[in-house]
Amino acid sequence: MKLIDMLNNIDTLLLSNSTNESHYKVALEEVSKLLENIQEQGDEDLSNFLWKLKTILIIKDRYIKTFFLLKDKKHYEAWVLLERIEIDISFLEKNVDEDFIKKYKLDFYKEIVESWQSLFPYKIFFSIGATIKQYTCSICGHVIRPRNKCIHKKGKLYNGKLCVHVADGGCELKEISMVKNPVQKSCIPMLDYDYSAVDFISERLQSPFDYWKPFKTKKLIDRSEFNTVDENDMCPCKESKKIFKECCFNKEKIEFPH
């Protein structure tokens, strides 16, 4: 297949509402192989373009997988994929212009990921604190120091490769903390969560590309309805991310999202 034909086919797939995962698998294999060949030739502009194309393919493919995981009520697996998509988007949007964003609807994926995440009941996360011996540049291998950095900028593309700082030389674990705003959102306590808000939406959507937006409302519930909730449990209001005794414990009525 000629290069132009391959790129046209991938472009058509990206602009379609197809949910056939085998098509995305084949497209990803093709663009990945092509990217490797172009990188070896040293064509930086084309390599960078192919990386962008590959990344938007990954984002779309992962979002389709996420949608059907949600339909199957595999909530945690979907949550993990949502975070991966969020990271992919953060890297991609640093390396594309407005025309690319509009053409491939990057803003749609960014907004829809945030919308799904807002419905999940996870409020507390585990966070690992560690001392990293050193970081190196993924492009040139240079050891990163405050006063001795290489020419490559973190998060930018170089010949179809993303510059990241790689933890090297081992690390020393210091602590595991419970936090409200984690670096890694997949580290959650495995509890019996209420996914009714997530399921309410997923059960009503027909396609991953159906547009929707959450609007949260509240209702007042008598404090007596929560007499069985321990004061050290998370507050039923689910808004403050505080334990019950530090939030709504002494109120006559509690505002409850529904």
Predicted regions mapped to residue ranges:
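Extracellular-facing segments of soluble proteins and assemblies that are Gly/Ser/Thr-biased and enriched
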Residues: I58-S118
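Polar/acidic, low-complexity leader/linker segments enriched in S/T/G and N/D
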Residues: M1-D72
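Short, charged low-complexity linear segments at domain edges
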Residues: F200-N232
